[in-house]
Structure formats: structure tokens, C-alpha cells
């Protein structure tokens, strides 16, 4: 569980045990975008009680989707499969999707914004 960052403000929204998995949900406020209201939800999956995690993997959903594409409420999907295989799984939710709140300029969000601002911030947080 990571509850802070030296890069930008981070809040631990929830820390849950779901069967054999641990699920930590973070809200990042990178502040690197022209829209300062952007906040990004990132879910970290791992095996409950496992201290040492493997290679990090970041999963991104497609348009009109959210983290549930990779991780169902019943613990099924690629995310849990990778976590059970020993990977350090991070599931990002883009601006205004899933647990990421809508930002002020929500109607103007673009894939270019995700690539230029959001993905580098998520990768830096995971790397930290």
C-alpha cells in the first residue's frame, strides 16, 4: 500500500481485501495538465498478504469503459489473473471514467491529453 507521493497529491481512497486479492484505490492529482481539476483513479491489485510484488503492469481501458473491463466485481479478468501470477497490477481509469471524477473541461478531453499528461503521471506514480 502506498499512501503518499513526492510527485503530486495522492489520496488512498480505499484498501480492501477481496478473496485472495488486495485492492488499493488511489486518486492522483498530477497538476501537469492545462485543466488543473484533473484527478485520476488507479487501482492496484495484488495477492493478499504478499509483500514483494513482481514486475509492474499497467492496464488501460478503452473508450466508454472503466477498470471493470480488466477486473470484475467477482475477481475475474486479466487483472486478477496477472496478480495471481505474481505481477504488480495497476489499473488506470482515464479522466471522467469509472472512479476518476469528471474534470472541469470534460467535454474537451482527448486521447492526446491522456498520452501527453495522464499516462506519464500514472507511470511515474507506479515507478515511485
Identify the role of each PLM range.
Residues 2-6:
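Flexible, low-complexity segments
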Residues 7-12, 75-80, 110:
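Secondary-structure junction/capping motif
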Residues 9-51:
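N-terminal cap/lid segment of alpha/beta-hydrolase-fold proteins
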Residues 12-16, 99, 128:
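Glycine/serine-rich loop-strand microenvironments at binding/catalytic pocket rims
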Residues 36-40, 88, 118:
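A general secondary-structure boundary signal
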Residues 47-101:
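Short, surface-exposed "cap/lid" segments of acyl-processing enzymes
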Residues 100-108:
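Surface-exposed, active-site-proximal loop segments in enzymatic domains
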Amino acid at each position: 500500500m502506498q499512501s503518499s507521493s513526492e510527485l503530486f497529491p495522492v489520496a488512498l481512497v480505499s484498501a480492501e481485501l477481496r478473496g485472495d486479492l488486495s485492492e488499493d484505490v488511489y486518486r492522483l492529482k498530477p497538476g501537469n495538465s492545462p485543466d488543473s481539476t484533473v484527478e485520476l483513479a488507479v487501482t492496484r491489485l495484488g495477492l493478499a498478504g504478499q509483500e514483494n510484488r513482481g514486475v509492474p503492469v499497467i492496464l488501460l481501458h478503452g473508450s466508454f469503459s472503466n477498470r471493470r473491463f480488466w477486473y470484475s466485481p467477482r475477481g475475474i479478468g486479466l487483472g486478477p489473473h496477472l496478480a495471481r501470477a505474481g505481477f504488480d497490477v495497476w489499473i488506470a481509469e482515464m479522466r471522467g471514467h469509472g472512479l476518476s471524477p469528471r474534470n472541469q473541461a470534460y467535454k474537451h478531453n482527448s486521447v492526446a491529453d491522456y498520452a501527453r499528461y495522464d499516462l506519464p503521471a500514472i507511470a511515474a506514480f507506479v515507478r515511485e
